[in-house]
Amino acid sequence: MIINYKFSDFYFDKKLSGKEVEFSIQIQKREASSDKNLQSKNLIIDAINVQRDFSEKNKSSDNLEILNKQIEDKNDLIINLEKKVFDLTLENKKNIDDFNEKAKSFAKKAQEELDKYKLELKSFLENEFEEKKKFSFQKLFENIINPLNNFRLAIDAGSKQENSSIKSYVQGFEMLLNQTINILESYGLIIIRPEIGDTFNPEVHNAVELREEGTPNRILKINSLGYQFHERVLKPASVIVSK
């Protein structure tokens, strides 16, 4: 049997209050009862059971709707989280790419600086080697110039003697001195030979005496020659200078 039923506005279940519903009632054959009141109670109980069944079904439907809404909300949350993860992944990749690019640039500059340093070091060592090689005989020349000077002074003094035998010895010594100087010059020794009247140069001349004579700052007399090894002065020429 199909029955249309409208629930009262004051029905205890707020979800059903004021609503009109349609439901079916299955009436089972019962044994006849002579008690009219009992028959009436049975009908009321059947109606209440139908209402309860409907209420439970409606409640289940509402619960399903709530559950679907929760699932939808969770899906939205998952989508948002996935988007954030994707954005962070892109940002992280960009940061990694930027870092790799900077690392490559730094490594390139570091390699360039290292290569430059290697070239400078190589050049320095080569120059240092050449410098040491160039002046390797300096100590020898420093030790030999004083005896060489004394030998020259002795020759100059002997050449002024009237004795022919002494002069012959002096000539032989002078030849030996010139040969020695030629050999030393081939290894970089330079004789500083000032001339009388030359301008005094403090870098290669040593003024042992000043005289008020002639043009100022001129060489008046040479006491001894000077020596230098390549561009290094080992012993300046000893001179007398006008002031």
Curated annotation (Swiss-Prot):
InterPro entries: GrpE, GrpE_coiled_coil, GrpE_head. Its main location: cytoplasm. It is found in: Cytoplasm. SUPFAM superfamilies: Coiled-coil domain of nucleotide exchange factor GrpE, Head domain of nucleotide exchange factor GrpE. It comes from the Bacteria. GO terms for cellular component: cytoplasm. Participates actively in the response to hyperosmotic and heat shock by preventing the aggregation of stress-denatured proteins, in association with DnaK and GrpE. It is the nucleotide exchange factor for DnaK and may function as a thermosensor. Unfolded proteins bind initially to DnaJ; upon interaction with the DnaJ-bound protein, DnaK hydrolyzes its bound ATP, resulting in the formation of a stable complex. GrpE releases ADP from DnaK; ATP binding to DnaK triggers the release of the substrate protein, thus completing the reaction cycle. This is Protein GrpE. The gene is grpE.
